[in-house]
A protein has these predicted regions:
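Membrane-embedded helix bundles of polyisoprenyl
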Residues: 86-99, 116-202
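Membrane-interface coil-to-helix junctions
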Residues: 1-90, 128-149
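Basic polycationic patches enriched in arginine
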Residues: 115-116, 209
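Membrane-interfacial entry segments at the cytosolic side of transmembrane helices
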Residues: 170, 206-212
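Transmembrane helix-loop junctions and nearby membrane-interface residues
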Residues: 2, 68, 100, 201-204
Length: 212
């Protein structure tokens, strides 16, 4: 049976990935080569504005990794970029859930390092499930949406830091990054953060009343 690149011949270059995104990533080579401008791109159909296209599809810093490869090696570059994004989403979610664990499940000071490690390892299925959820696997064909999945756990971590009255840079920096990397997905993340904040305020208030 057919397998997937790089082990077999089947690649992710189907649908929009083949018809749109591959030429867009190729256009970055012309941009850094000085053949085109960030303001006007001759390789875009009959020529046209490039800023809008760049902001929507290519603003992620991951996009520039493709310029380290020749155009002929773009399948490998996009494969590595996709794997990197999915892996990083698991890493950032791991940071978030470990923060929550430490916040609400503090272990006694005399707890051994082995038991602390074991406690954190029990959380491992959560970031794995987050990284390999159906959304990520589906949108591996539209990889500009994956940056939001990477940054969302950091945004939620920032909300938790705000609730703890810590520095708001924990929230501002990932929020700025997600708006720059892909402004289309950023408003969805913003709405989710607002709902998450409301949920956390309600649960905090409920716990406060219960303690009284």
């Amino acid at each position: 049976s057919n397998g997937f690149y790089p082990f077999k011949e089947v690649t992710l270059f189907t649908f929009d990935m083949k018809e749109q995104y591959l030429p867009f990533f190729s256009s970055l080579h012309y941009l850094i080569g000085g053949d085109d401008s960030i303001f006007f791109h001759w390789s875009k159909s009959l020529g046209g504005n490039y800023i809008g296209l760049y902001a929507y599809y290519l603003a992620s810093p991951f996009s520039w990794l493709t310029t380290l490869f020749s155009i002929e090696k773009l399948p490998l570059a996009i494969f590595l970029m996709t794997v990197s994004k999915i892996s990083l989403s698991g890493l950032t979610f791991s940071v978030y859930v470990n923060f929550l664990w430490n916040k609400y499940n503090s272990l006694p000071a005399q707890t051994s390092s082995y038991r602390r490690l074991l406690a954190h390892l029990t959380l491992l299925p959560l970031p794995i499930a987050y990284a390999l959820m159906s959304y990520n696997l589906q949108f591996a064909l539209s990889i500009m949406w994956l940056d939001g999945v990477i940054l969302l756990p950091l945004l939620l971590l920032g909300v938790e830091k705000l609730l703890d009255k810590q520095r708001n840079l924990w929230f501002i920096l990932p929020l700025t990054a997600i708006f720059y990397f892909n402004y289309y997905i950023s408003y969805m993340a913003g709405i989710f953060c607002a709902l998450y904040l409301l949920f956390r305020l309600l649960t905090t208030y409920s716990h406060s009343r219960h303690d009284l």
